[in-house]
Regions:
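Interfacial aromatic-anchored transmembrane helix boundaries in multi-pass membrane proteins
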Residues: 91-106, 127-168, 198
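Membrane-helix interface "capping/anchor" motifs
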Residues: 71-79, 115-126, 163-167
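Short juxtamembrane and helix-loop transition motifs at transmembrane-helix boundaries
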Residues: 12-13, 39-48, 66-70, 89-90, ...
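Residue-level signature of the transmembrane alpha-helical core
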Residues: 84-88, 109, 113, 124, ...
């Protein structure tokens, strides 16, 4: 019988600490969202100078920082470099598409990309940070930081549970994510803004209002039309991007290896990062010594 490992408690403590930080970060973002929905602060669109905007900015930023701190020890340098790129991608595409007659947003491609490569916590942090940074140019997006974080979290969970291993499942996961995100964002759009800020999405809300719907009902219907299709497109674009990466580049991300996020990441490939086996253990079954050496 082998004796219990004396190093196990010290190995478990960092994992427990990371989990606690993730929970605290999620709670900070959720609490800020509840505050906005319950208080319905109309002055939040005036910029970061208002009290409600400062509360929202502090709550969302605290949640995003806690999430980043939680996952930072597990993130490779390649992910840290990608996060600022993802923020810029979200803001540029979101600002451009929001000014057109396209009834979509396309402001979550960077968020979903980070979520697929680095996991739910990193995706949620990227989504929240995107809204925070974007709010300095467009204050109306700040209250939607909770929805952006939720999209990143759900995208990371979809990747973890294999919905990106089959290309056709990616838009299905995006469609489902869009339904949830639309329901979450509708109260903010209704009670804080009295509508949506996009040109095309605002026209859809106006059409439902003209048919006699209440403001919340009209915005919810618009969200259930636009958000699922938008997220299906976003998830599909991200799937194309990650599969276009060379296999060696994809396997640089620990989350991708650990959870076999993409097709072709077999257990043998994942084992390439595992600690070397002890004496008496040969290559994995079904592989030749030559292929094992190449791995």
């Amino acid at each position: 019988m082998s004796s219990p490992s004396l190093t196990l408690p010290s190995q478990e403590r960092p994992a427990a600490r990371r989990r606690l930080l993730e929970i605290l970060g999620a709670l900070a973002i959720a609490a800020t969202y509840v505050y906005l929905v319950l208080n319905q602060p109309a002055d939040i669109t005036g910029g970061p100078g208002s009290a409600s905007a400062l509360i929202a900015l502090t709550g969302f930023l605290a949640g995003a920082v806690l999430l980043i701190v939680a996952v930072l020890p597990t993130l490779p340098a390649s992910t840290l470099v990608l996060i600022p790129v993802a923020l810029v991608l979200n803001i540029v595409l979101g600002q451009f598409v929001g000014s057109t007659l396209v009834p979509f947003y396309l402001d979550a491609i960077g968020t979903v990309l980070i979520a697929v490569l680095a996991g739910p916590a990193a995706g949620a942090a990227t989504g929240a940070l995107s809204s925070i940074v974007w709010s300095f140019f467009n204050p109306t997006v700040l209250p939607f930081a909770a929805g952006a974080a939720l999209i990143g979290c759900l995208a990371g969970l979809a990747a973890r549970y294999g919905l990106f291993r089959r290309f056709y499942l990616a838009p299905v996961a995006g469609f489902a994510t869009g339904i949830i995100a639309g329901v979450v964002s509708a109260p903010v759009a209704a009670f804080v803004f009295g509508g949506t800020s996009g040109v095309a999405t605002g026209a859809i809300v106006s059409a439902f209002r003209a048919m006699g719907d209440t403001l919340l009902a009209a915005i919810t219907k618009q969200a259930l039309i636009s958000d699922p299709m938008d997220k299906a497109i976003v998830f599909t674009v991200v799937a194309i991007l990650v599969y276009a990466l060379p296999r060696r580049a994809r396997l640089q991300f620990p989350f991708v290896r650990r959870h076999r996020v993409l097709a072709g990441n077999t257990p043998v490939e994942a084992a390439a990062d595992a600690p070397a086996q002890g004496p008496g253990h040969g290559p994995a079954q079904g592989t030749s010594p030559d292929s094992a050496r190449k791995g």
